[in-house]
A protein has these predicted regions:
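C-terminal accessory/tail domains of diverse enzymes
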Residues: 1-361
Length: 361
């Protein structure tokens, strides 16, 4: 949650602030060795009686691990370039850069972020976190791209902070969730007794290979792939399924009765340079709630990535209200499949079980 809730749109291993476990599979293994060596060195200096630990020790132990896939130490979620580098005076400023934090749109949202960080520093100063690091694997770019699971993870963080004596209310972070995972629309399928809600989700964009350009080479970012969160409340899993463009969504239970969530990954537009350039755009996305007992669609909705009429917007939104109105105007509670509808068997990915990738045929 702390890596993705407050970040910008460009996330993932090739972003400006990748997580330490997003680039290499053995990174956490090496990081645990570095932590153990730091503890050994601190104990060694304390045992010597001088009680002095060289301040450059942190830089030498971690600088080669807190880097992106190309070895750039500045592109890291935790950048220690200016903490205490022995290479020069500009690197000894005592600064730790948290590069995964994007400036929020309101001062009070920034205030809550700073309060949370200060409380965490105070807590870990008092009781250091020494538990084994979790190997999330592909779950990072699967269920933690969805706002529901990011919110659950933050709830666990806040519960731990409250148990340590730092009281944080979940409502303080509601604006952050609405800003990071904006609501697209909601439809009630009265015949099925359920509600279907769509929200924007996160998507780790890829950096393409080098291409020739005037004056040198360039590497484009493939921003043509987007993701939506599909959240269903009150669903009877033995009778109803949800499909998008004719494919069954692999909905997963959240632990709450009747609540199911999944992500839908799709090609929003077709740029000239992208991964799998022969795959066209999947918009508009047509969602259907299918009654498998009666083989018919009992409700649904339709979502357009851009202007529903196929036009381009002539101007940028003047403020957040206009941007929100455009997003809501692209959502329709009509347009789903009428009449008889047979849902195909659900196909769950071994690597990403919470996500349906429409690029897969």
């Amino acid at each position: 949650a702390l890596s993705y809730l407050f970040s910008g749109l460009f996330i993932g291993p090739t972003s400006q602030a990748p997580r330490v476990d997003e680039a290499r599979n053995d990174q956490l293994y090496e990081l645990e060795i570095a932590f153990a060596e730091l503890r050994r060195q601190v104990a060694l200096h304390e045992g010597a009686g001088d009680g002095y630990t060289p301040p450059w020790l942190i830089d030498r132990a971690l600088r080669n691990l807190l880097a992106d896939v190309t070895g750039n130490t500045h592109r890291s979620e935790f950048c220690i370039d200016k903490l205490y580098s022995p290479d020069g005076a500009t690197g000894r400023l005592g600064l730790l850069e948290l590069r995964a934090f994007e400036m929020p749109p309101h001062a009070r949202m920034s205030l809550v972020q700073q309060l949370l960080l200060r409380a965490m520093v105070a807590r870990f100063w008092r009781t250091p976190y020494t538990a084994r690091l979790t190997r999330w694997g592909t779950a990072l770019h699967d269920r933690f791209m969805l706002g529901t699971f990011v919110q659950m993870d933050l709830e666990d963080v806040l519960a731990e902070m409250r148990s340590a004596g730092f009281v944080f209310e979940s409502a303080w972070f509601a604006p952050h969730f609405e800003f990071r995972f904006p609501r697209v629309g909601e439809v009630e399928a009265e015949a099925a007794g359920l509600s279907l809600q769509l929200r924007a989700a996160l998507e780790p964009w890829h950096v393409m290979g080098e291409e020739g350009a005037a004056g040198g080479t360039v590497r484009y970012v493939d921003s043509s792939v987007e993701r939506l969160e599909v959240r269903v409340l009150g669903m009877n899993e033995t009778r109803h399924v949800v499909t998008v463009n004719g494919r069954t969504i692999p909905l997963q239970p959240t632990g709450r009765a009747g609540e199911y969530v999944a992500g839908v990954r799709y090609r929003a537009w077709a740029p000239p340079s992208s991964l799998h350039p022969t795959i066209g755009a999947h918009a508009p996305l047509t969602f259907d709630v299918v009654d498998t007992w009666m083989d018919r669609s009992v409700g649904g909705c339709q979502y357009h990535v851009s202007h529903p009429g196929g036009r381009n917007y002539q101007t940028f939104p003047v403020n957040a209200y206009e941007a929100e109105s455009r997003r809501l105007a692209r959502f329709f509670t009509i347009g789903h499949t009428p009449g008889r509808s047979v849902a195909p068997p659900v196909e769950r990915s071994l690597e990403f079980p919470f996500t349906l990738d429409l690029r897969q045929i």
